[in-house]
UniProtKB/Swiss-Prot annotation:
Name of the molecule in the record: Serpin-Z4
Keyword terms: Plant defense, Protease inhibitor, Seed storage protein, Serine protease inhibitor, Storage protein
Purpose of the protein: A major component of the endosperm albumin, this protein acts as a storage protein during grain filling, contributing a substantial part of the grain's lysine. May have an inhibitory function during filling or germination. Inhibits cathepsin G in vitro.
Organism: Hordeum vulgare
Keyword NADP: no
InterPro entries in alphabetical order: Serpin_CS (IPR023795), Serpin_dom (IPR023796), Serpin_fam (IPR000215), Serpin_sf (IPR036186), Serpin_sf_1 (IPR042178), Serpin_sf_2 (IPR042185)
Gene Ontology MF annotations: nutrient reservoir activity; serine-type endopeptidase inhibitor activity
Family, per entry: Belongs to the serpin family.
Membrane spanning stretches: none
Tissue: Highly expressed in embryo and endosperm. Is accumulated and stored in the endosperm, where it exists in a free and a bound form. Expressed in roots, coleoptiles, shoots and leaves.
Induction comment from the UniProt entry of this chain: Its expression is regulated by the 'high lysine' alleles Lys1 and Lys3a.
Reactive bond, annotated site positions: 357-358
């Protein structure tokens, strides 16, 4: 059973949200990435980088500054947040009707090295990490298979190959990874017989035909500032957690990027626009969509100011017993999100590699027609932790 979230961790959660929105903005600033659909788990990346921070020495301050409040901060806050996230936010309550969640951290270290006992204890106890010795030097392909199989198992087959071909060789010394699986049923499922084909307007001004889910039931919708926000709660288990998907729909058909900019520059934006009550709906349409998205995150993290871990100046000496320097060469992240009448299925994995409610008020009918590009996120509302975030520019594109 998930426990109550510690109050002193809530500020760290605000920092995690800030990191999530900055990273989302960095992804969208790349024209090639921005043109398609995007889905990723900032929580997965945050936990992976926090684990690196736990093993860093002189490099630690820069990591904490990016992951925390933008100042020097304290690595202990990141460890405390990770522990609360693993034990509270990502606890599995599917047996009592809540979302099915699986989350795992893994540390794969070359047989020529050994983890420092203090780091291994912290990783196992606070991050619930699995540690495993592998032979990158002599059995590279076998080691890659072990990492990929581990991710595939945790994500129940949604993510089969987190490590791209050629990404690991005999100079690889360490892989830190995590994998996340989320499957939630809507609190109010959509009637499949109401799903109809209609037009979705693309950013270039053209239109496509796609499947839209529809409903006449009351919905959580807020309207303000040329923006509508839809909250779709997932069915709950017996604990206090409440997961929800949020659809942020700009008023203008081409308003996605201006909305994205506001989201990244105003950390309180999400909280200020969360619908607080249900309303009667008029025309209500939400497209079904499926997104598979993968990217290498080191260049994005550098753009955010995280330079040292990826350079020869990296100091990860609190992680392994070795006289040889260790730096992070790659951070691979892959996500999958599917939204349909039943609910949402989502998965994410990150690997970092080292190389040497109130009563509803009576209101007018509110339309919510998501027939043009929009942002979405999946959040645990009690803690305020953003688990997945992304945007849909074309619901017909799945990869």
């Amino acid at each position: 059973m998930a426990t109550t979230l510690a109050t002193d961790v809530r500020l760290s959660i605000a920092h995690q949200t800030r990191f999530a929105l900055r990273l989302r903005s960095a992804i969208s600033s790349n024209p090639e990435r921005a043109a398609g659909n995007v889905a990723f788990s900032p929580l997965s990346l945050h936990v992976a980088l926090s684990l690196i921070t736990a093993g860093a020495a002189a490099t630690r301050d820069q990591l904490v500054a990016i992951l925390g409040d933008g100042g020097a901060g304290d690595a202990k806050e990141l460890n405390a947040l990770a522990e609360q996230v693993v034990q509270f936010v990502l606890a599995n309550e599917s047996s009592t009707g809540g979302p099915r969640i699986a989350f795992a951290n893994g540390i794969f270290v070359d047989a020529s090295l050994s983890l420092k006992p203090s780091f291994e204890e912290l990783a196992v106890c606070q991050y619930k990490a699995k540690t495993q010795s592998v032979d990158f030097q002599h059995k590279t392909l076998e080691a890659v298979g072990q990492v990929n199989s581990w991710v595939e198992q945790v994500t129940t087959g949604l993510i089969k190959q987190i490590l791209p071909p050629g990404s690991v060789d005999n100079t690889t010394k360490l892989i830190l990874g995590n994998a996340l699986y989320f499957k939630g049923a809507w609190d109010q499922k959509f009637d499949e017989s109401n799903t109809k084909c209609d037009s979705f307007h693309l950013l270039d001004g053209s239109s496509i035909q796609t499947q839209f889910m529809s409903s006449t039931k009351k919905q959580y919708i807020s309207s303000s500032d040329n923006l509508k926000v839809l909250k779709l709660p997932y069915a709950k288990g017996h604990d206090k957690r409440q997961f929800s998907m949020y659809i942020l729909l700009p008023g203008a058909q081409d308003g996605l990027w201006s909305l994205a900019k506001r989201l990244s520059t105003e950390p309180e934006f999400i909280e200020n626009h969360i619908p607080k009550q249900t309303v009667e709906v008029g025309r209500f349409q939400l497209p079904k969509f499926k997104i598979s998205y993968q990217f290498e995150a080191s260049s994005l993290l550098r753009a955010l100011g995280l330079q040292l871990p990826f350079s020869e100046e990296a100091d990860l000496s609190e992680m392994v017993d070795s006289s040889q320097g260790l730096e992070i060469s790659h951070v691979f992240h892959k996500s999958f999100v599917e939204v349909n009448e039943e609910g949402t299925e989502a998965g994410a994995a990150t690997v970092a590699m080292g190389v040497a409610m109130s009563m509803p008020l009576k209101v007018d009918l509110v339309d919510f027609v998501a027939n043009h590009p929009f942002l979405f996120l999946i959040r645990e509302d009690i803690a305020g932790v953003v688990v997945f975030v992304g945007h849909v520019t074309n619901p017909l594109i799945s990869a």
